[in-house]
Amino acid sequence: MNKLTLKSCLARTDELGVEIVGDVSYRGECNKEDGELATLHQKITFNFPEYAHLAFHVPNEFTADKSKGNAKFAHIAKRKAKGVKNGMCDYVVLPIRLGAPPFLCEMKRRDISLSLKTAKNKLHYLEQIELLASQKQHGAIAFVSLGADYAYQKFIEYVEKWK
């Protein structure tokens, strides 16, 4: 396998037809993904309370305590058995009406290079976009957003089209 780079990750995203909303060339200070997710959730639930019960973050990140040894593997196996999907996007809005697609957002930092700093981050990202591409092929609105503002704008467009 070739060495993973930011450029190769972005090229793969494009090949799979997964949209990135935001400026991929931006480099600079920005909020972390968790802050962006909280901002997106607050904007959606405050401005669209009628959809608040349909909108949620998928908490599928897991950092094991190295002192626990094999507990990490047991925890991962248990999560997998319960249907936790590795690579699932960060934010989901279930269909806002009958016939509307789900809204699936993978949140990255405004400076995407900060989200994809390590080889491990890049591999995980490729797994995420493969899943997003599959979900998009099955009718979902599935994309990567560089910050909450872009995701929120995409949500407004989604509501205008599907309400």
Labelled PLM ranges:
Residues M1-K163:
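Catalytic phosphate/metal-binding cores of nucleic-acid and nucleotide-processing enzymes, i.e., regions
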